[in-house]
Amino acid sequence: MSTDLYGWLECRPEPGRFGAEHVPWEPFSELRHLHWARDYMSWSALFDVRSVEPVNALFPDRGAPADISDTARRDADDFEGHSHSWFSWRELSSVDWNAPCTDGLSRYWVRRWSRTPEGSLEPEGLTALPDELYDSAAAEFGEGNIAPSRWPADGKLLLGNEVYRPVTPAYRDLVPADGPWQPVFDVMGTLAGLHGEDNVRLVVWFGG
């Protein structure tokens, strides 16, 4: 069964900017206008949704903000969703994207390295272990050690011109800077420059 992501980007003027100390949040854009991909890999790192293994998610299941905008609240209430959460631009901009998001080697992901025409290896993105390598993993590391987390840290398997190695994934591996979240983060950063880092946030929930 597939899962879908819903939500609203919200902002508010800097409190006190127009004389009012309490400024309500306003809906800026429905998330679907900026992000529509079923990107389970990034959802696991951000919200611990559709995770294939234990991940130290950044903003898991925080619930909807108490002061959510009326428009976003109506949408969230009308939809029987789950895993409601949110994050501000300040929180997002303080993330160490190079930090590991799992406790040790991933039991699911491996790093794929491709051989260049010159013969050197260049790292590519993360991928699940190809089915063709299951037998090779059993032969190389033992029948009970097919999961990459059970390989030696320097273990590797070859498939054609590609090499697969175990990896402790970083948040940036699961949420690439040029991935589906780029438009969302770009807009949030622009709004934060205008209204302040604490006055821009994304509210999300999931269906399915």
What does each model-found stretch correspond to?
Residues 1-196, 207-208:
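Acidic (Asp/Glu-rich) sequence patches and key acidic residues
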Residues 198-203:
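C-terminal interaction-tip segments
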